[in-house]
Amino acid sequence: MRKIMLIASAMSALSLPFSANAIEFDENSLECGPYAKVGIVGGVLSGVESARLDPADSEGKKHLPLIKGMPFGVTLAAGMTITPGVRAEISAMYLMNVKAEVELGKMGSDANTGTTADASAGVIRKHKKLTPPQPNIMPISIADRDIAVDIPNAAGQGNVDVRAAARIAWLKNYAGIDYYVPDSNNPQGRVVNPVLLNIPQGNPNPAGGGGRAAPAAFDILDHAQWRDVVVGITALSNANKPNVSAVKILSDKISQIYADIKPFANVASVQISETPLPDSASVDQIQNKVQELNKVLEDVRESFDGFILNAFAQPVRLNFQIPQVVQGQGQQPQAAATAQEAAAAAAIRALNDGENNGIIQLYKDLYKLQRNVALKKSMKQLGDELGVDQGQEGGCSKDKKQSDTTAEESKKEGKKGKEIEFDLHMAVGQVKLYADLFTIDSFSVYAGIGAGLAYTHGKIDGKDIKAHTGMVGSLALGVAANVADGVYMDVDAGYLYSFSKIEEKYQMNAFVASAGIRYNF
């Protein structure tokens, strides 16, 4: 029997009621005391999926398949055997090759695993339509209200559309209200939007009492009615303020546009900056971001101009101007914040005017191009299939040769279609607790549980990301073997679970296995 001697002097110093007699454990029990461990670790990613949608999915819900890498790395730990068979440790693990490739060339059900007829039937699919960002109605400032009240009518004897064009445009851009709407009684006609009659106009409690009756009709050329409508719209817009800042709304809007056009920009070698506007963006940063967006959209349009008829002809011109109230703001923090919000709101309104600034037409043209390219590819595949059928008269050898050629081309296409979606590194620190389940000779089977933090950095879509820190938990089941006096070999397998997502896209869970040497001091 092995004895661990408890020194009498130490016990006396601690005033503990123990004698100097030895405490005896079974020969195969693990010794109490501190230990250190070093080892290697490897695993397989689990639960993570591509953030890219499969363009072949008409519902726009299916994600492209991922080819996941096998993470590997090293682990270091320091711990304490608390009682025989129970130990606690602090461990650090560094994982490399946390990566995955997306199969751009393989569209799920497009795989040629069926008959020729099946392959031909699945060639033409309905593509998800590109949809421009929806307009955002922003609160109207007092300065914008005062400017709008004084919008004049155009001189002359023209119709309302011409004389009140500036006022009609203000209603659309600032309030999202169309001045004219289709006439329900006459499909070919149009009437003044009845919503304009429901907007509070003027003082609801004028002197003398009795209230104020709503007008029977709205005349946009009438300056008094126009002033009252502008004041009413301003009050309503500020009563329904969004919960997020104008800068955040603008940043999200630009990010959505960039995400929509990115495939086309990549083909045209147009660089897209995926850095969002910070919440504290200055007026100059907002102006530069809008100018950058205008340049990117115009570069994409020019790149495809002439590829198909009657498309990409309307230039993209974002009519963004810094509001006059912003230009006169001081440098005080409160004034700077007001200027920031006003500039962001003006930029949002410039993007809202998609009919005139060219954004809506660009989306239509890109969708037309997408369908045109898909149709050409489908026709080529269909022609290849028809060529196979016609070649059957020439004998089996010709069919086999053509089939081999098609298979070889498919392999090449598949290789070209792979792109690294993310390539990350993870540093994981955990506090773990292990307990032996049972012991046989010099072997013991143990289970463990752990919790801690994971620090992740690297690249997503080829761009460096901001380092992410999140909570993780783990479970493990393993075997420990006593290979020498005080030296043990641990081999275990388990599951690492992440409680948060990186970039709000990827949840890095993994099945992991490790092997290490543990030395008891």
Swiss-Prot record:
SUPFAM superfamilies: OMPA-like. GO terms for cellular component: plasma membrane. Keywords: Cell membrane, Membrane, Signal, Transmembrane, Transmembrane helix, Virulence. Residues 386-415 are annotated as: Disordered. Residues 396-415 have a biased composition (Basic and acidic residues). InterPro entries: OMP/PagP_b-brl, TSA. This is 56 kDa type-specific antigen. It comes from Orientia tsutsugamushi.
